[in-house]
Amino acid sequence: VMHDGKFGYEHAFNSIDILNSNNKNLFIISNSSKRSKSSIDRLPKLGFKKNSFINTVTSGEMIWQLLKKKFLSDKNKKNCFHIYDEEKEDGLDFRDGLNFNFVEKVEEADLILACTPFVKLQPIDYIPLLEAAYNKEITMYCANPDFETVEINTNNNIFCMGAIGEIYKKMGGNVIIKGKPCLLYTSDAADEQDR
């Protein structure tokens, strides 16, 4: 773990300095639902130097790339129900470059893009939404496989989209998840080194 959400840990700074001084190639592999560029741009705010790392690969980026490749055509544009935290300023940025009609009701959707939980909803509150999706056989693309994280200000455990994806999977729903410990992460990072 490199940071607490606000600033980097001392052990992370020290380790990175030692590895950089020994000419080691460093990659960040993260289960963040954010795109990689967004995570890279955030590094200085956390106290890290961007040039300390060769690349950053996030689960969010892997899902975005998958959706971009899978739904290229303007023909029969798909309806997407997007689950995201409306209070986060970059919540809608994930949509940039994706070729979907974004809809407000899951019943109108062809797929679900699950990035970050809606504000003030608990896992149980998703059951009606997931039941409606299951009845329509809608696939969920989950951009964060983590089940929970620690809230910075309160130190409370809060759930992540991976928990909602797991509920949907146990209901019988189809869930596509990318992230650690998926082997594609390491190959994506290695591909970047070869470029």
Describe the predicted segments one by one:
Residues H11-N23, P128-A133:
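Catalytic-core regions built around general acid/base machinery
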Residues A143-L184:
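Glycine/Thr-rich beta-alpha phosphate-binding loop at enzyme active sites
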Residues L98-L111:
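Short acidic low-complexity segments
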Residues P117-D125:
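Active-site glycine- and acidic-residue-rich loops that bind
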Residues V1-G5:
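Asp-based phosphoryl-transfer active-site loop
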Residues N14, N20-N99:
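Active-site phosphate-binding/coordination module
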Residues Y185-R195:
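Single conserved hydrophobic/aromatic residue that forms the stacking wall/gate
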Residues L111-C115, Y141:
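Structural motif
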